[in-house]
Structures are given as structure tokens and as C-alpha cells.
């Protein structure tokens, strides 16, 4: 199995920590005036989703995680699982609710997603960065009502709720950033 040393650390690097695959979110090399240099990292455990701050002594090696990121197409959902298909081999993968997590509210039929596999099973599903969804419910925006925050909640076709500007109406299609859950623009 491949290993990485602290000099290889960079955001996005996947390795094993306590028997669980992790990804480095951010890292910083620290050389104190007195004592040994170390690398300060913030890692996210891929299975549990926990974010931890971990320090590694300079030169420490860690085992590479045997995970694969695949570009898969979302097919359908049944009672307990979401199904994704590889666009070239047509192989199907089923992901449970824990693996899908918050991505559920951004999944559209035939959407291209990045699915992270560990030991052949999906552990995380990442939806596209931007999705276009129709507004199915929102309060009507009254003309001249600009006092306050200038936004209102809107329910989208997938059930997600986002804050939108007052001029957006029911039936319009909007673009949403799935990473932050924020309104980006109207789609013409």
C-alpha cells in the first residue's frame, strides 16, 4: 500500500486515520522557534463526516486511502437506496442515506455526481456544483417591499428550501450553488 509523508500533504489528499479514510481540508507547515517542526492539518473523515484538527510531526508517514472518485450518473431512488450508473460501463452502484447525506436535496434525474467508493461501496456522494431547479412554493413579492433583508424563502422541486430575492416567483427556474445552498441567478 502506498504511503504519504507530511511533505506530500495538500488539500484533497486522502489517507487512512484510525482505520477510516480521511481527506485533508487544509494544512500548514509550522516551524516553531524551539522544538521540532510539524504539520497542522484539518481533516474530514469520509465515513462519519467529522472534521478534526490533527498535528503530524515532520517526516511522519500515513497510509494512502484506497478510495476512488467516480463520475456517475444519478438514475433513481427507491425506499432505501439511491442508484447511480457508470456512463461507460453501465455498472450500477447503490448508496444508502448516510452516503448521500445532504446531497439528496440537489439530486436530479440524470445528474452527473462524484461518488467516492471505499472497498467498492459508496461512502459519499457529491452533487454537481450548480443545479437548476424550479420554484414550487414561495411568498409573492410585493412591489416596493424592500425593507428588511430583501429575501424570502422558496421551496424547490426537490424539496430544498433556499433564500431568494423578492422578484423571483413560483414556476421560475433558478440556479443554486449546492456547496453553500445559496441562490445564484434566474435561468432564462
UniProtKB/Swiss-Prot annotation:
Sequence positions bearing N6-(3,6-diaminohexanoyl)-5-hydroxylysine: 34
Gene Ontology biological process terms in this record = peptide biosynthetic process
* Cited function: Involved in peptide bond synthesis. Alleviates ribosome stalling that occurs when 3 or more consecutive Pro residues or the sequence PPG is present in a protein, possibly by augmenting the peptidyl transferase activity of the ribosome. Modification of Lys-34 is required for alleviation.
**Native species of this protein?**
Haemophilus influenzae (strain PittGG)
Q: Which gene encodes it?
A: efp
Concerning Gene3D superfamilies, the annotation shows: 2.30.30.30, Nucleic acid-binding proteins
The family database entries (InterPro entries) matched by this protein are listed as: Elong-fact-P_C, NA-bd_OB-fold, Rib_uL2_dom2, Transl_elong_fac_P/YeiP, Transl_elong_KOW-like, Transl_elong_P/YeiP_cen, Transl_elong_P/YeiP_CS, Transl_elongation_fac_P
What PROSITE patterns does UniProt report for this protein, alphabetically? EFP (PS01275)
Q: Where in the cell is it found?
A: Cytoplasm
- Provide the protein name: Elongation factor P
Q: What GO molecular function annotations does the UniProt record carry, in alphabetical order?
A: translation elongation factor activity
Tell me its family: Belongs to the elongation factor P family.
What post-translational modification does the entry describe?
Answer: May be beta-lysylated on the epsilon-amino group of Lys-34 by the combined action of EpmA and EpmB, and then hydroxylated on the C5 position of the same residue by EpmC (if this protein is present). Lysylation is critical for the stimulatory effect of EF-P on peptide-bond formation. The lysylation moiety may extend toward the peptidyltransferase center and stabilize the terminal 3-CCA end of the tRNA. Hydroxylation of the C5 position on Lys-34 may allow additional potential stabilizing hydrogen-bond interactions with the P-tRNA.
